[in-house]
Every structure is written in structure tokens, then in C-alpha cells.
Amino acid sequence: MKQDDLEAIATYLKDIPAESAATAPLSADDPSMQAGAAIYRDLCAACHKLDGAGVAALFPSLAASGSVASREPTSLIRVVLRGAQSVSTSAAPIGPRMPAFGWQLNDAELAALLTYIRNSWGHAAMPVTERTVRNARSRLAVRND
């Protein structure tokens, strides 16, 4: 595939509107939100920033992403488990890579992290459960050692 095609696909996917079944974000006092916030600060905020805004042309904004709060969290789970390679841009000719966290986070931690991301910065989405993460991890055959 040509680079222009890859960039067009990436742009399209980033612009898909959210399809959330939740009507209001979880409270910041919710235990899963607190646990997820701590993990986010430790592992994600350096690139995606505390406000979820990311860094233009380098690290995507989670706050502006419709797919973050989509009804089905499997794509988001996959990215966090396996990491992702960004397309090349003029600002980053090699294209930054998000590391895989599947080896580092257990199912409960990953569920808390994604629940936090899906309910922050104006998003309102159903919480991600340990079972959903476990099933996705199994389907993706990610080694946890």
C-alpha cells in the first residue's frame, strides 16, 4: 500500500464518531477510575499528556478520538496490548511507535486504564471489564510473561 493510502485510512479511522452506550462519564471517585488514572499517569501521560491532548503530528489525542469511547473496546484493547506503529510524517519520518503493555499490565489493570481513558476528557463510555480484556487477550494470543 502507498504511504498516501495508509495516511488516508488512518485519518478516516480517527474521524469515526463514537458509538457509546453510556450517557455520562463515570465519577472520578469510582475505584476503577482512580486506579486507571494512576496507571495512565505512569504509562501514558508522557506521550498523550495529562489532558489527553497528545502531541500534534507525533502522539494522537485521546481526548479528540471518537474511537476511544466506541461501543466495542476491542480495538483499543488491542492497541494497548500489542502497541501500534504510527505512519510517517514530516515531523516524524520514522513514525513513532507506541509500546506494547500486554506484558506489563494484568487484565484488571488494563480494564481500569481503559475505563479511565474511555470516561475522561468529555468521553462517556461503558467500563471495560476484566473479562472483556481476558477474552481479547486470549483471541490475540498475547503472551503475558
Give the predicted meaning of each segment.
Residues 1-46, 88-145:
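Flexible coil segments in periplasmic/lumen-exposed cytochrome c-class electron-transfer proteins
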Residues 29-57, 64-82:
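Sequence/structural segment immediately N-terminal to covalent heme-attachment motifs in c-type
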Residues 58-68, 87-88, 95-97:
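A cross-kingdom feature marking solvent-exposed beta-strand/loop segments within repeated
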